Amino acid sequence: MRLNPIKIKIYNEDEFVKKAVYFSELFEEAALYFSNKKKDTSLPKFYKDYDFIFAFNSTKSIKASEDSLTKLNKFISKYSFWKFGFFSYNLKNEVQNISSKKQNTFNIPNMFFFVPEFIIYKKNSQVYFDSENSSIDSHYILKEINSIKLKKPKKFNLNFRCTQKKPNYLKKIKQIQEYIKRGEVYELNYCMEFKTTQQICAEDFFLSTNKKCMAPFSCFFKFENLKILSFSPERFLKKINDKLISQPIKGTIKKSNNFYQNLKLVNALEKSEKDISENVMITDLVRNDLSITAKRNTVKVEELCKVFS
């Protein structure tokens, strides 16, 4: 194992990160994370560490749908190198006295993590290469990535359809209204699945969408035969020593190509009662969830209803 990561040079970062996405096709497991905003000042600097992290190939992995967190803790304790992975929606059934009957279409486990063969990441304007295996040649890996020929960007016209039929949707809305009348909830998010059967290149689609979204928490994740594409504006959790940070977001508005029009839109969003209500709701929800395991009086809301763009 290397004592320290190796500093490497990348001469065209935009091209390199695109090629890295296509390079992931060679491996069954890979995780590529993008911060996207190189000069972003909207997030506190303390909360942003990396511009990108690319992890390739699995040397060890773990997946579980029972006792997942205990198994993960043992896995983390056993291996000292980086770990990458995900928790799926149904993990909630293990930690809360609740359950759902949603169909697990892709047979995704409650938890999956892997130790990569090597990683490439950018931090504080410097790019690094790291691996547990000192025989892995960083120059060879970089040469392989740089040798990839970039494809001409494709235009996508995907037709998504909701998997829920209209009568069932209206029935669910009436149930929600009854919950609100009875005081069981005062506000909630009702999520539905949309799908398409069109064949696409996931790597092409990720790069095309990522260029448009430029979300600060974007990810391209490969797991067995599954590819997960995520473009999120919010952070679920970040751990710094004994401090946990969550940055949920609610309330959105369209963006304009005109700077002055954008200022008006920001002002409208800041004054929107609906969006303020949603933002306060999700902040209160996260605060309550963190309070379950946090030391008393340590959960603090550092910022509320600030607009990020």
Task: Provide a role label for each language-model segment.
Residues 1-309:
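Extended alpha-helical targeting/anchoring segments
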